[in-house]
Amino acid sequence: MILKENLTVVSQREIAPRIFEMVLKGDMVAQMQAGQFLHIRVPDASKLLRRPISIADINKEAQEATIIYRIEGRGTAIFSQLKAGDKLDCLGPQGNGFDLSVIDKGQKALIIGGGIGVPPLLEVAKQLCKKGVEAYAVLGFANKDAVILEEKMSQYATVVVTTDDGSYGQKGYVSTVVDNLDFLADAIYACGAPGMLKYVDKKFEKHPHAYLSTEERMACGMGACYACVVHVKGQEDAQNLRVCEDGPIFETGQIILD
């Protein structure tokens, strides 16, 4: 069920250039699942559209959730100025979330993340660790300065970092590592740039438990306006799915990635 609540800012800090980590507190946290997102109103009357931001970490005991976002425009720049005690008008938790029920203790999971797509995978890794799943995370970034969440992710998974320019970790893309893995994962969870998702979608198209977290521009965020639709493979003229309502998580081989 989608709720509307004014969440309280507990803390905020810049963790990489233009990338901020914000902790929010409220009753809504009790309903959150890995892979879902919040649709947040910008506290500025001139900004009409809410911003969808993925949930990175969920602490239901403390009623706190962490979001991580990158400044992309005026709206997110305003978010970055908020202080502890400020309120944010949030709709959520929204989206279907990752399916973690398909994997059990003793099995292996592969987590593939790129850039600002890494945050929603942190809660995935945490929940898999709690289940006793052996998780292996491959995280790709542009350069050393852009690397985020390596230390936190390492608490729950074996982590390999790649950078495009080789300034940190292994030089290359996540595909450089994934193509050379010596094990077959029982489940795969991915989030990142379109190019990375296309790679994962193609490589694991026939895998029974491989999932992609997608991003599309949203307007209403409630499934009514169809501004965030994606096309189903093989049914391009017949069926659209809404990222806000039917996603943002889809199985590999299910949708057309533009």
Curated annotation (Swiss-Prot):
UniProt keyword Transport present: yes
Organism: Streptococcus mutans serotype c (strain ATCC 700610 / UA159)
Residues given in the record as [2Fe-2S] cluster binding sites: C220, C225, C228, C244
A Pfam cross-reference name: NAD_binding_1
Cofactor: [2Fe-2S] cluster; FAD
InterPro entries: Cbr1-like_FAD-bd_dom, Cyt_c3_hydrogenase_gsu, Dihydroorotate_DH_ele_sf, Dihydroorotate_DH_Fe-S-bd, Dihydroorotate_DHASE_ETsu, FAD-bd_FR_type, FNR_nucleotide-bd, OxRdtase_FAD/NAD-bd
Pathways per UniProt: Pyrimidine metabolism; UMP biosynthesis via de novo pathway; orotate from (S)-dihydroorotate (NAD(+) route): step 1/1
GO biological process, one term: 'de novo' UMP biosynthetic process
Designated name of the protein: Dihydroorotate dehydrogenase B (NAD(+)), electron transfer subunit
